Amino acid sequence: MSTGNVYQELIRRYLVVVKKLYEGKYEVSRSFSYTMFSLLVGIIGKQYVTVFYGVPVWKEAKTHLICATDNSSLWVTTNCIPSLPDYDEVEIPDIKENFTGLIRENQIVYQAWHAMGSMLDTILKPCVKINPYCVKMQCQETENVSATTAKPITTPTTTSTVASSTEIYLDVDKNNTEEKVERNHVCRYNITGLCRDSKEEIVTNFRGDDVKCENNTCYMNHCNESVNTEDCQKGLLIRCILGCVPPGYVMLRYNEKLNNNKLCSNISAVQCTQHLVATVSSFFGFNGTMHKEGELIPIDDKYRGPEEFHQRKFVYKVPGKYGLKIECHRKGNRSVVSTPSATGLLFYHGLEPGKNLKKGMCTFKGRWGLALWSLAKELNKLNDSIKVNQTCKNFTSTGEENKQNTDKQKEFAKCIKTLKIDNYTTSGDRAAEMMMMTCQGEMFFCNVTRIMRAWNDPNEKKWYPYASCQIRQIVDDWMQVGRKIYLPPTSGFNNHIRCTHRVTEMYFEMQKIDSNETKMQIKFLPPSETSNQFVAYGAHYKLVKIMPIGIAPTDVKRHTLPEHHKEKRGAVILGILGLLSLAGSAMGSVSVALTVQSQSLVTGIVEQQKQLLKLIEQQSELLKLTIWGVKNLQTRLTSLENYIKDQALLSQWGCSWAQVCHTSVEWTNTSITPNWTSETWKEWETRTDYLQQNITEMLKQAYDREQRNTYELQKLGDLTSWASWFDFTWWVQYLKWGVFLVLGIIGLRILLALWNTISRFRQGYRPVFSQDCQQNLYRKRPDNGEEESNSLELGEHNSENLKEESLNRSLIEDLTSFARE
């Protein structure tokens, strides 16, 4: 039986055992099954690390977005590259992702806000950064009171749902009865003219809180506290900017309402955001996408519990069915002239200084009542302390009854007016308490106190839609510390300023009305938090970086593609976005199309590079002097660096330009193996993320060892190594080492012999004969006849021994003294 058949038979038996365990009384977990399967695979044979290039894996990233636009105005083209006619979008099925992170860490929101600030600085570019109005002025305060006036309205507006004969709605107060009292200062000051010793007196108007006066001697407020810059031109703010990712990156977009209680599944991969609204406003977001349903997006740095609900901030996406809009206008009742000064500045002032020339009017149209009621219902889902009557839609009547039945109108008004709004009656910075917006390049600051007061009164059955506005020239900088001085309103008696803004978002925070926190109200956010206008768009996006290199254990046999793999080429033709289309598929099915997939990935990155380079070359003359031009070039370099880094890493592992690369590194973690039939690459990467560092180091070491072995093998097989035997220099070198070895042995022998001799001499006197021989001599005594002859011989022998002994002693003494010395 072959290895493959044995493997299949063991798998079959394993599945039978697991099935019986599940059917029995014992409960077996899924992890136990995976562990048993892993042990089975380990018993069958070793597994080795295999490198895959082109897997659908990503991680959150931070990089510069590319500013793209299809607008042809100069101020946009100097900062952005032209956008493409269309951008691809690919759905990613069977993938869940978390989109409820911190808003301040969302790269789309953060970069869109800074990009828009750069754009607005370009639109409203100051001439020079000096304090043009920091001079002594003589001013007189006047009050221009617009008494109670009636403003005819030709088209009635409702605040209910879709107008029909069966729905009751709030009637609209057609009379503008708000008293508008604005303090106005008529100021005179001198500037040096263009001629020598000539001065010119300037007379202009300032809003009451823009100047600080003592005895009619005034200076512009905050003159010594911040930088004041004068604007030189006007511009129109329109929807024209896209935020696009550089090559190698993708934006994930969630296509449903955000939910903190579960992961998001309806996800698609895109290259660019939707059009960003290039406007600056407070309280409301204008001219954005028409939302199908309401959605609350928290913008707090951290989640707060119910006990701190009054401190939370939100962005509410207003459903488009309510048709909320704000119409603003200013009559063409003034002219503007400019006066040059010796410093090169142009001071703009009006020809009619005695009148309040900067007033405008805005009208709130649409079904505001039901819109605020729907907001209350969304807040009630988060906190039960927000009381909402869910039966307000049950109030119905005919059209004639709706006009006559005032009691039913009052009941309907009380029903929907459960959410209170801060009416800004407390003292404070009036600029922060007024609704700010741009209207044809002018800065409108509108007082909405009367509107909020009418809404907070449950007995008021009518909707009051009017807000008086002031066109301000001195405005706080919303991006940094400082104040900007804008041009006076557009000149010309017949030049009316008109604009209509669709309300698509509301920006507010929760406040407690009493100390017991039983009642709460909302407070719209001031202009200092203009970054909130991008939360409604950016919260549904996540910037990620493609990680195309994957590592997984496989069998020793090289993975081969089936014969029909060419049919899958069309499924991944979208390049880098097509790579993510298989993110929810199993690892095995992705590996089948991996060759074409990785080729498509490389092709997609290269194609993005070509498109980006072509667009940058078209705008090179305009982009080279701007900061955004540098950022756009930097994004291209970043994407190239990432691609080269991946290829260098594959080269270190010996997997250059290989889609599936088998290695000799053993997979030691037998308890962690992929489920090729049901597990995705994203899930596998999450499980083995902590092993990546060790595996990559082992791959590098294994490839280095393989390279050394290959080099040594090549050396053995090289014929030139055998020819070195006939080289004379080679023989001389080894002969020299042989001579040194022989001389060393001889010297060692001499030293050992000398040491033995010295050691013997240092042992001292030793008897010539042994004790046994002396005993035998005494034991065998000779006869008397022989005694004399033996004694003579013995005497001679003793004398010789004494001489020898004395000689030895003298020699030992000499050697001892020599050794001591």
UniProtKB/Swiss-Prot annotation:
A single BP term in Gene Ontology: virion attachment to host cell
Cytoplasmic side: 759-821
Record note on domains: Some of the most genetically diverse regions of the viral genome are present in Env. They are called variable regions 1 through 5 (V1 through V5).
More info: This is an African mandrill isolate.
Cysteines engaged in disulfide bonds, as pairs: C67-C80, C127-C232, C134-C223, C139-C187, C244-C272, C439-C499, C446-C469
UniProt entry tagged with the keyword Metal-binding: no
InterPro entries documented for this protein: Gp120_core_sf, GP41-like, HIV1_Gp120
Residue stretches of biased makeup (Basic and acidic residues): 794-805
Coiled-coil annotated spans: 607-627
Stretches the record annotates as MPER: 715-736
Record topology, Extracellular segments: 1-737
Role this protein plays: The surface protein gp120 (SU) attaches the virus to the host lymphoid cell by binding to the primary receptor CD4. This interaction induces a structural rearrangement creating a high affinity binding site for a chemokine coreceptor like CCR5. This peculiar 2 stage receptor-interaction strategy allows gp120 to maintain the highly conserved coreceptor-binding site in a cryptic conformation, protected from neutralizing antibodies. These changes are transmitted to the transmembrane protein gp41 and are thought to activate its fusogenic potential by unmasking its fusion peptide.
Start and end residues of each stretch annotated as V4: 446-469
Chain segments annotated as transmembrane: 738-758
V2, as annotated region: 187-223
Region entry V5, spans: 515-526
PTM field: Specific enzymatic cleavages in vivo yield mature proteins. Envelope glycoproteins are synthesized as an inactive precursor that is heavily N-glycosylated and processed likely by host cell furin in the Golgi to yield the mature SU and TM proteins. The cleavage site between SU and TM requires the minimal sequence [KR]-X-[KR]-R.
Keyword Transmembrane helix: yes
Record-given protein name: Envelope glycoprotein gp160
Molecular function as annotated in GO: structural molecule activity
Stretch list, region Fusion peptide: 570-590
Region (Disordered): 780-805
Sequence motif YXXV motif, residues: 765-768
